[in-house]
Protein backbone atom coordinates (compact mmCIF):
# COMPACT_ATOMS: atom_id res chain seq x y z
CA UNK A 1 0.00 0.00 0.00
CA UNK A 2 1.51 3.32 -1.03
CA UNK A 3 1.56 6.09 1.54
CA UNK A 4 -1.24 8.61 1.10
CA UNK A 5 -0.34 12.29 1.08
CA UNK A 6 -2.88 15.11 1.41
CA UNK A 7 -1.74 18.54 0.29
CA UNK A 8 -3.59 21.86 0.18
CA UNK A 9 -2.75 23.16 -3.31
CA UNK A 10 -4.97 26.23 -3.50
CA UNK A 11 -5.71 28.51 -0.55
CA UNK A 12 -8.53 30.73 -1.73
CA UNK A 13 -11.20 29.95 0.90
CA UNK A 14 -14.01 29.35 -1.57
CA UNK A 15 -17.51 29.59 -0.12
CA UNK A 16 -18.63 26.36 -1.77
CA UNK A 17 -16.11 24.82 -4.16
CA UNK A 18 -17.65 22.12 -6.36
CA UNK A 19 -17.48 20.19 -9.63
CA UNK A 20 -13.73 19.65 -10.05
CA UNK A 21 -12.76 18.57 -13.60
CA UNK A 22 -9.24 17.94 -14.88
CA UNK A 23 -8.40 19.38 -18.30
CA UNK A 24 -5.39 17.40 -19.49
CA UNK A 25 -4.63 19.64 -22.50
CA UNK A 26 -3.95 22.64 -20.27
CA UNK A 27 -2.93 20.74 -17.10
CA UNK A 28 -5.63 22.77 -15.36
CA UNK A 29 -8.26 21.97 -12.73
CA UNK A 30 -11.63 23.51 -13.45
CA UNK A 31 -14.15 23.97 -10.65
CA UNK A 32 -16.88 26.34 -9.50
CA UNK A 33 -17.65 28.39 -6.41
CA UNK A 34 -21.43 28.12 -6.40
CA UNK A 35 -22.62 31.11 -4.29
CA UNK A 36 -19.84 33.37 -5.59
CA UNK A 37 -21.16 32.76 -9.14
CA UNK A 38 -17.64 32.00 -10.33
CA UNK A 39 -16.03 29.42 -12.62
CA UNK A 40 -12.35 28.92 -11.75
CA UNK A 41 -9.42 27.41 -13.61
CA UNK A 42 -6.26 26.57 -11.65
CA UNK A 43 -3.09 26.05 -13.65
CA UNK A 44 -1.19 23.25 -11.90
CA UNK A 45 2.09 24.33 -13.53
CA UNK A 46 2.05 28.10 -12.90
CA UNK A 47 -0.19 27.83 -9.79
CA UNK A 48 -2.26 30.71 -11.14
CA UNK A 49 -6.05 30.90 -10.92
CA UNK A 50 -8.25 32.46 -13.58
CA UNK A 51 -11.90 33.26 -12.89
CA UNK A 52 -15.01 34.00 -14.90
CA UNK A 53 -17.96 35.57 -13.09
CA UNK A 54 -21.50 34.72 -14.19
CA UNK A 55 -24.97 36.08 -13.39
CA UNK A 56 -26.34 33.31 -11.15
CA UNK A 57 -25.10 30.48 -8.90
CA UNK A 58 -22.93 28.20 -11.06
CA UNK A 59 -23.01 24.61 -9.89
CA UNK A 60 -21.03 22.56 -12.40
CA UNK A 61 -18.62 22.92 -15.29
CA UNK A 62 -17.55 20.43 -17.97
CA UNK A 63 -15.32 20.21 -21.02
CA UNK A 64 -16.75 20.75 -24.51
CA UNK A 65 -15.55 18.88 -27.60
CA UNK A 66 -15.78 21.95 -29.83
CA UNK A 67 -13.71 24.05 -27.42
CA UNK A 68 -14.46 26.06 -24.33
CA UNK A 69 -16.70 24.67 -21.62
CA UNK A 70 -20.30 24.07 -20.63
CA UNK A 71 -21.73 24.99 -17.25
CA UNK A 72 -24.96 24.89 -15.28
CA UNK A 73 -25.84 28.44 -14.23
CA UNK A 74 -29.04 29.05 -12.28
CA UNK A 75 -31.49 26.79 -14.14
CA UNK A 76 -29.71 27.17 -17.48
CA UNK A 77 -27.43 24.86 -19.43
CA UNK A 78 -24.82 27.25 -20.86
CA UNK A 79 -21.79 27.34 -23.13
CA UNK A 80 -18.82 29.26 -21.73
CA UNK A 81 -16.14 30.82 -23.92
CA UNK A 82 -13.13 31.21 -21.65
CA UNK A 83 -11.18 33.58 -23.91
CA UNK A 84 -13.78 36.36 -24.01
CA UNK A 85 -15.68 35.25 -20.87
CA UNK A 86 -18.95 35.11 -22.81
CA UNK A 87 -21.85 32.90 -21.78
CA UNK A 88 -24.43 31.55 -24.23
CA UNK A 89 -27.64 29.86 -23.07
CA UNK A 90 -28.18 26.42 -24.63
CA UNK A 91 -31.35 25.40 -22.74
CA UNK A 92 -33.44 26.22 -19.68
CA UNK A 93 -35.26 23.97 -17.18
CA UNK A 94 -37.58 24.32 -14.17
CA UNK A 95 -38.96 27.60 -15.50
CA UNK A 96 -42.05 27.13 -13.32
CA UNK A 97 -39.88 26.83 -10.17
CA UNK A 98 -38.36 30.25 -9.56
CA UNK A 99 -36.63 29.12 -6.36
CA UNK A 100 -34.71 26.28 -8.04
CA UNK A 101 -31.16 26.06 -9.31
CA UNK A 102 -28.99 23.39 -10.84
CA UNK A 103 -26.56 21.47 -8.67
CA UNK A 104 -23.95 18.89 -9.69
CA UNK A 105 -23.48 17.90 -13.33
CA UNK A 106 -21.27 15.67 -15.48
CA UNK A 107 -20.96 14.52 -19.09
CA UNK A 108 -21.76 10.91 -19.99
CA UNK A 109 -19.64 8.71 -22.32
CA UNK A 110 -21.84 9.69 -25.30
CA UNK A 111 -21.31 13.41 -24.74
CA UNK A 112 -24.61 14.26 -23.03
CA UNK A 113 -24.46 16.74 -20.11
CA UNK A 114 -26.36 15.38 -17.11
CA UNK A 115 -27.32 17.70 -14.25
CA UNK A 116 -30.01 17.90 -11.61
CA UNK A 117 -31.80 20.67 -9.80
CA UNK A 118 -32.76 21.52 -6.23
CA UNK A 119 -34.48 24.30 -4.32
CA UNK A 120 -32.25 27.14 -3.13
CA UNK A 121 -30.99 26.46 0.39
CA UNK A 122 -31.82 28.69 3.36
CA UNK A 123 -28.75 27.19 5.07
CA UNK A 124 -26.42 24.41 3.90
CA UNK A 125 -28.55 21.28 3.28
CA UNK A 126 -31.69 23.11 4.54
CA UNK A 127 -34.25 23.59 1.77
CA UNK A 128 -37.76 22.85 0.53
CA UNK A 129 -37.68 19.16 -0.28
CA UNK A 130 -38.68 17.21 -3.42
CA UNK A 131 -38.40 20.26 -5.71
CA UNK A 132 -35.59 19.02 -7.96
CA UNK A 133 -35.35 16.90 -11.11
CA UNK A 134 -32.64 15.14 -13.10
CA UNK A 135 -32.03 16.27 -16.69
CA UNK A 136 -29.62 15.77 -19.54
CA UNK A 137 -28.68 18.12 -22.34
CA UNK A 138 -28.26 16.18 -25.58
CA UNK A 139 -25.71 17.25 -28.22
CA UNK A 140 -28.53 18.82 -30.29
CA UNK A 141 -29.37 21.02 -27.24
CA UNK A 142 -32.63 19.19 -26.55
CA UNK A 143 -33.29 18.39 -22.89
CA UNK A 144 -34.53 15.13 -21.43
CA UNK A 145 -36.11 15.00 -17.96
CA UNK A 146 -35.64 11.67 -16.18
CA UNK A 147 -37.48 12.06 -12.88
CA UNK A 148 -38.53 14.63 -10.29
CA UNK A 149 -39.08 14.63 -6.50
CA UNK A 150 -35.33 15.15 -5.97
CA UNK A 151 -34.03 16.85 -2.82
CA UNK A 152 -30.39 17.71 -3.62
CA UNK A 153 -29.29 16.31 -6.97
CA UNK A 154 -25.64 15.50 -6.57
CA UNK A 155 -22.78 13.15 -7.53
CA UNK A 156 -23.03 11.15 -10.74
CA UNK A 157 -20.88 8.89 -12.89
CA UNK A 158 -21.02 5.86 -15.20
CA UNK A 159 -19.60 2.35 -14.91
CA UNK A 160 -16.56 1.49 -17.00
CA UNK A 161 -18.68 -0.58 -19.41
CA UNK A 162 -21.19 2.32 -19.63
CA UNK A 163 -24.07 0.02 -18.63
CA UNK A 164 -24.71 1.50 -15.17
CA UNK A 165 -25.42 5.10 -14.14
CA UNK A 166 -24.55 5.98 -10.53
CA UNK A 167 -26.38 8.83 -8.85
CA UNK A 168 -26.67 10.58 -5.49
CA UNK A 169 -29.68 12.47 -4.14
CA UNK A 170 -27.94 13.72 -1.02
CA UNK A 171 -30.78 13.64 1.51
CA UNK A 172 -31.52 9.99 0.73
CA UNK A 173 -28.08 9.24 2.27
CA UNK A 174 -27.51 6.60 -0.40
CA UNK A 175 -25.61 5.99 -3.61
CA UNK A 176 -28.02 4.64 -6.22
CA UNK A 177 -27.54 2.80 -9.51
CA UNK A 178 -29.63 2.57 -12.68
CA UNK A 179 -29.34 0.37 -15.74
CA UNK A 180 -28.01 2.66 -18.47
CA UNK A 181 -28.57 2.47 -22.21
CA UNK A 182 -25.75 4.48 -23.74
CA UNK A 183 -27.17 4.86 -27.29
CA UNK A 184 -30.43 6.42 -26.06
CA UNK A 185 -29.44 7.80 -22.65
CA UNK A 186 -32.35 5.93 -21.04
CA UNK A 187 -32.16 4.89 -17.38
CA UNK A 188 -34.17 2.22 -15.57
CA UNK A 189 -34.24 -0.16 -12.60
CA UNK A 190 -33.18 2.17 -9.79
CA UNK A 191 -31.62 0.49 -6.75
CA UNK A 192 -29.39 1.42 -3.82
CA UNK A 193 -25.78 0.24 -3.89
CA UNK A 194 -24.53 1.95 -0.71
CA UNK A 195 -26.15 3.36 2.42
CA UNK A 196 -24.10 6.01 4.23
CA UNK A 197 -22.86 5.32 7.75
CA UNK A 198 -23.84 7.94 10.34
CA UNK A 199 -20.35 9.40 10.69
CA UNK A 200 -19.98 9.66 6.91
CA UNK A 201 -22.75 12.26 6.93
CA UNK A 202 -24.11 13.57 3.59
CA UNK A 203 -23.04 12.06 0.23
CA UNK A 204 -22.03 14.81 -2.19
CA UNK A 205 -19.85 14.64 -5.32
CA UNK A 206 -18.60 11.35 -6.79
CA UNK A 207 -16.15 9.91 -9.31
CA UNK A 208 -15.06 6.47 -10.53
CA UNK A 209 -11.60 4.88 -10.74
CA UNK A 210 -10.06 2.48 -13.28
CA UNK A 211 -11.12 -0.49 -11.15
CA UNK A 212 -14.78 0.54 -11.32
CA UNK A 213 -14.93 1.59 -7.68
CA UNK A 214 -16.69 4.79 -6.63
CA UNK A 215 -15.21 7.66 -4.62
CA UNK A 216 -17.73 9.79 -2.73
CA UNK A 217 -17.05 13.10 -0.99
CA UNK A 218 -18.84 13.23 2.37
CA UNK A 219 -20.21 16.68 3.20
CA UNK A 220 -19.87 17.38 6.95
CA UNK A 221 -17.97 14.07 7.14
CA UNK A 222 -14.56 15.48 6.25
CA UNK A 223 -13.58 12.54 4.06
CA UNK A 224 -13.77 10.77 0.75
CA UNK A 225 -14.74 7.11 0.79
CA UNK A 226 -14.09 4.40 -1.77
CA UNK A 227 -17.00 2.03 -2.40
CA UNK A 228 -17.48 -1.22 -4.26
CA UNK A 229 -20.86 -0.76 -5.98
CA UNK A 230 -21.14 -4.50 -6.63
CA UNK A 231 -20.81 -5.60 -2.99
CA UNK A 232 -22.06 -2.42 -1.30
CA UNK A 233 -18.96 -2.40 0.90
CA UNK A 234 -16.77 0.56 1.81
CA UNK A 235 -13.17 -0.26 0.88
CA UNK A 236 -11.29 2.82 2.05
CA UNK A 237 -11.67 6.10 3.94
CA UNK A 238 -9.41 9.11 3.43
CA UNK A 239 -9.94 11.85 6.02
CA UNK A 240 -9.20 15.49 5.24
CA UNK A 241 -8.48 18.40 7.63
CA UNK A 242 -11.83 20.03 6.78
CA UNK A 243 -15.41 18.88 7.42
CA UNK A 244 -17.27 20.20 4.39
CA UNK A 245 -15.76 18.08 1.62
CA UNK A 246 -17.97 18.54 -1.44
CA UNK A 247 -16.60 16.71 -4.49
CA UNK A 248 -13.66 14.85 -5.98
CA UNK A 249 -12.08 14.01 -9.32
CA UNK A 250 -8.94 12.35 -10.61
CA UNK A 251 -6.36 14.37 -12.52
CA UNK A 252 -2.68 15.13 -12.78
CA UNK A 253 -0.12 12.71 -14.14
CA UNK A 254 -1.95 9.71 -15.67
CA UNK A 255 -4.99 10.65 -13.55
CA UNK A 256 -3.14 9.31 -10.50
CA UNK A 257 -3.93 12.30 -8.27
CA UNK A 258 -7.27 13.09 -6.65
CA UNK A 259 -8.48 16.66 -6.29
CA UNK A 260 -11.04 17.47 -3.60
CA UNK A 261 -13.16 20.61 -3.29
CA UNK A 262 -14.76 21.80 -0.08
CA UNK A 263 -16.90 24.56 1.39
CA UNK A 264 -16.86 27.08 4.22
CA UNK A 265 -20.39 28.54 4.02
CA UNK A 266 -22.39 27.71 7.14
CA UNK A 267 -19.35 27.36 9.40
CA UNK A 268 -19.12 29.30 12.65
CA UNK A 269 -16.25 31.70 13.40
CA UNK A 270 -14.96 29.11 15.85
CA UNK A 271 -15.17 26.38 13.22
CA UNK A 272 -13.25 28.49 10.73
CA UNK A 273 -10.52 29.11 13.31
CA UNK A 274 -10.30 25.37 13.89
CA UNK A 275 -10.28 24.60 10.16
CA UNK A 276 -8.41 27.44 8.41
CA UNK A 277 -8.24 25.39 5.19
CA UNK A 278 -12.03 25.22 4.85
CA UNK A 279 -12.97 26.16 1.29
CA UNK A 280 -9.56 25.32 -0.16
CA UNK A 281 -8.58 22.78 -2.84
CA UNK A 282 -6.76 19.59 -1.83
CA UNK A 283 -4.67 17.09 -3.76
CA UNK A 284 -4.39 13.47 -2.60
CA UNK A 285 -1.55 11.32 -3.90
CA UNK A 286 -0.51 7.76 -3.14
CA UNK A 287 -4.00 6.27 -3.42
CA UNK A 288 -2.60 3.41 -5.50
CA UNK A 289 -5.36 3.66 -8.09
CA UNK A 290 -5.97 5.95 -11.06
CA UNK A 291 -9.05 7.61 -12.43
CA UNK A 292 -10.32 8.02 -15.97
CA UNK A 293 -10.41 11.12 -18.16
CA UNK A 294 -13.62 13.17 -18.02
CA UNK A 295 -15.94 13.07 -21.03
CA UNK A 296 -16.62 16.21 -23.08
CA UNK A 297 -20.01 17.59 -24.11
CA UNK A 298 -20.62 16.78 -27.78
CA UNK A 299 -22.86 19.75 -28.63
From Swiss-Prot:
Pfam families found in the cross-reference section: SGL
Annotated tissue distribution: Detected in liver (at protein level). Hepatocytes and renal proximal tubular epithelium.
Modified residues (N6-succinyllysine): 144, 244, 253
Chain positions with Phosphoserine modification: 268
Top-level EC class: hydrolase
GO molecular function: calcium ion binding; enzyme regulator activity; gluconolactonase activity; zinc ion binding
Binding site for substrate: 101, 103, 121
InterPro entries documented for this protein: 6-blade_b-propeller_TolB-like (IPR011042), Regucalcin (IPR008367), SGL (IPR013658), SMP-30 (IPR005511)
Pathway involvement of the protein, from the record: Cofactor biosynthesis; L-ascorbate biosynthesis via UDP-alpha-D-glucuronate pathway; L-ascorbate from UDP-alpha-D-glucuronate: step 3/4
Intracellular or extracellular location(s): Cytoplasm
GO (cellular component) term, any one: nucleus
Keywords: Ascorbate biosynthesis, Calcium, Cytoplasm, Hydrolase, Metal-binding, Phosphoprotein
pH curve summary: Optimum pH is 6.4.
SUPFAM superfamilies documented for this protein: Calcium-dependent phosphotriesterase
Functional note: Gluconolactonase with low activity towards other sugar lactones, including gulonolactone and galactonolactone. Catalyzes a key step in ascorbic acid (vitamin C) biosynthesis. Can also hydrolyze diisopropyl phosphorofluoridate and phenylacetate (in vitro). Calcium-binding protein. Modulates Ca(2+) signaling, and Ca(2+)-dependent cellular processes and enzyme activities.
Complex formation: Monomer.
Name this polypeptide is given: Regucalcin
Amino acid sequence: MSSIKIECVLRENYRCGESPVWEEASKCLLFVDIPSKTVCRWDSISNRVQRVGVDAPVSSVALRQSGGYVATIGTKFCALNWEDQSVFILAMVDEDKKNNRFNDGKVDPAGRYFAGTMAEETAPAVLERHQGSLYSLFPDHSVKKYFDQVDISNGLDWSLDHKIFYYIDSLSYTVDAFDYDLPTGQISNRRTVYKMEKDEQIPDGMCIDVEGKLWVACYNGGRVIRLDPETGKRLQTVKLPVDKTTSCCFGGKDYSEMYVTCARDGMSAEGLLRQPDAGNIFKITGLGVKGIAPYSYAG
